[in-house]
Amino acid sequence: MKAASIRNKGLRDLINNRYLYLLAIPAVLFSIIFAYLPMVGVLIAFQDFNPIKGLWHSEWIGLDNFKFFFRGQEWMTITYNTVFFNIMFIITGTILSLALAVMLTELGKSIVVRVMQSVMILPNFISWPIVGLFSVAFFTADTGVINQFLSTIGASTIDFYTNESIWPPILVVLNLWKTAGFGAIVYMAAIVGIDKEMYEAARMDGASRLQCIFRITLPMLKSTIVMLFLLSLGNIFGGNLDMIYSLVGDNTFLTDRTDTIDIYVFRALRTSGSLGMTQAIALYQSVIGFILVITANKIAGKLDKESALF
């Protein structure tokens, strides 16, 4: 009886909202064709894949492709680098985006603020290969802008492309420059939705601007912050291939501190040509990322139900 009632309720909902469901059909089809059907390719991770024989006739080798990746210490280094960079990107990006959003909102709707918003989001539309080309002009040992400036003031120059310890902060700063402005726009949209009467009531009680920010704005943004964090967490095992490879390339001097999973997969595919090994690494990356999202979502749901994605 209960199952029949649920079916009838679902059918009524389908009929009542038929036009909304029709609008969703293109997005559903797009997801099925480009996100779910390609997942059949995961089988390559368990095969000695031969393009001529195809997916269904290649030799099955079990977990041998995974053994190739996990047999040495290299996988620990690139996993650490991947997680480290993404955690730094998420933490610093969230803090700076929030700070920019709050500051610009407090400044009001002047022409200066609108110009600043346009300038902030501009780096988001510049591709990483273009940034990589500009970085050469800044970081080259002899003719780079930074080293020429250091020489002018009598300071010692820095050989950026052989000094691996300097690149983690460079990558974090460049990521902030490119993404923080766009992230601030998202938080500004959330701030606009906060009830203005709450601020008016707080000011009538004698609250300062700083108190309004910490007692009203930031607490009201909690759900948005958690939601964006959960979405970012899904990519914490993503290696930012376009960013890091555009800036560093195949520089062996910097491998230990800048190699991430995506770059390792890209290099392995070019050097070994084994699709099975690269797919095994990509599968490891995806499974760990999925587990992290599910775990973080459960924790967020227990702490605050409104903050969970599902």
Placement of each model-derived feature along the sequence:
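A structural signal for multi-pass alpha-helical bundles of membrane permease subunits
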Residues: 12-310
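Short, Lys/Arg-rich, polar N-terminal cytosolic tail immediately upstream
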Residues: 1-14
